[in-house]
Regions:
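Generic N-terminal targeting/processing segments that precede catalytic cores or assembly contacts
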Residues: 1-163, 167-169, 364
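N-terminal charge/polar-biased segments
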Residues: 1-18, 32, 36-39, 140-141, ...
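A structural signal for small-residue-enriched, beta-sheet-centric alpha/beta enzyme cores
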Residues: 3-6, 13, 169-175, 180-199, ...
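Surface-exposed flexible segments
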Residues: 85-87, 226-229, 362-368
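Flexible, glycine-rich phosphate/dinucleotide-binding loops
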Residues: 159, 220, 358
Length: 375
């Protein structure tokens, strides 16, 4: 694709999804099967409204079956499916209608709570609709009223899937055929949020009332090494703590417990719900404000503002005899902000650092931890 977007001052090329590849391959294969003529390029209108002109590769034609592939173009997005061939095989059936299934390298759903039911191929709703509509369009143009069986496959899919969330989500044997717009936007935050939502929905439909959240690897390591809990029980929020909490509320969870490094969670005390550094870095400002409220002043406050890390600031608090008081105040502030964010569910947080270990927790954290272990 030649189209691009500007993000953080950089010109980034767009790509197209595995769903677009599958739909285009199915459209091309259906055309060749029903017309009897070879087609080396195909046009596809994506749900986003952008039209793609795609090269058709690895064509196999027979009177009863046609198979072809579209090569995945991820643009400037660091996507593991880049350059993967997504195949569609189309054959006629005696039963009227279009049946869509997954073949080699396309995962199977083994757990409830996902876009597709247990046992179905991991071809999500929008790609399924795209495949259906494009194959129906070809049937209409060529006057075909019989049935078609469409199988989507990705020969490299089983290997690629090991690098994705699929094994964790209960999708076995391959990748998922994804995409809501048909277009890949480089480094899309929405794609990450959507992945978190899928995992939360799966937990909820599995009967969980309480959920453990962690921003990333530090939190996961602490959960395993210090708390003795399988880190797979936690949902990784990345920087999207606010979005994750709101999704928990919307999905009907009764409570959430967030466990994370102070470098991330201190930002919650300032109402920063996306903790990525590009949205600001108020760590020392918040810690210094809490320390000032407990009596820190003058040169010590100025020194804290200049600390490079939270562990440096904690060292200073120990020297000033304010360590426990400031952490207690910080936990209270985080508690207030989490309650303000999601007042209709129970919320809690536990903070730690790599150097000092356990630091503090909000007042409801221990109770939530017990409930999560029981849930």
């Amino acid at each position: 694709m030649k189209e691009f977007i500007i993000r953080d001052g950089k010109k980034l090329r767009l790509g197209y999804t595995t769903g677009s590849c599958a739909a285009a391959a199915a459209k091309a294969a259906a055309w060749m099967l029903l017309s009897g003529s070879k087609k080396e390029s195909i046009r596809l209108l994506t749900p986003k409204g952008m039209e793609l002109a795609l090269a058709v590769e690895d064509i196999y034609l027979s009177p009863d079956c046609v198979r072809c592939a579209i090569r995945k173009d991820s643009g400037d997005d660091p996507d593991i499916t880049r350059d993967t061939l997504i195949y569609a095989e189309v054959r006629k059936t005696e039963t009227v209608g279009i049946v869509i299934d997954g073949g080699q390298g396309v995962g199977r759903v083994t757990m409830p709570g996902l876009d597709q039911p247990v046992g179905a191929a991991a071809i999500n709703s929008v790609p399924r609709r795209m495949i259906q509509e494009n194959v129906e369009e070809v049937c209409g143009l060529l006057g075909y009223t019989g049935g078609l069986y469409v199988v989507i496959s990705a020969p490299d899919g089983e290997t690629l899937a090991k690098k994705t969330f699929n094994p964790r989500l209960g999708i076995e044997g391959g990748i998922s055929i994804l995409g809501t717009t048909g277009i890949v936007e480089p480094m899309s935050e929405q794609a990450l949020v959507d992945t978190i939502h899928v995992e939360l929905r799966q937990r909820r439909e599995g009967g969980a009332d309480y959920v453990l959240l962690a921003p990333g690897n530090y939190g996961a390591d602490y959960i395993k090494g210090v708390m003795g809990i399988d880190p797979a029980t936690a949902v990784m929020t990345s920087n999207f703590i606010g979005d994750t909490m709101e999704m928990c509320r919307e999905l009907g969870f009764r409570g959430v417990l967030l466990i994370g490094h102070i470098g991330k969670l201190v930002k919650l005390a300032g109402g920063m719900w996306n903790t990525h550094s590009r949205y600001g870095d108020c760590r020392m400002d918040i810690l210094t404000a809490c320390a000032a409220a407990e009596g820190l002043h003058g040169g010590a406050a100025a020194e804290m503002l200049c600390c490079a890390t939270c562990d440096d600031a904690l060292r200073l608090l120990k020297e000033q005899g304010l360590y426990d008081a400031v952490l207690h105040r910080l936990a209270g502030r985080i508690d207030d902000m989490m309650h303000y964010k999601c007042s209709d569910i129970e919320t809690g947080a536990i903070l730690f650092s790599k150097e000092y270990g356990y630091l503090c927790e909000t007042k409801g954290a221990s109770k939530l931890l017990r409930r999560i272990k029981e849930d």
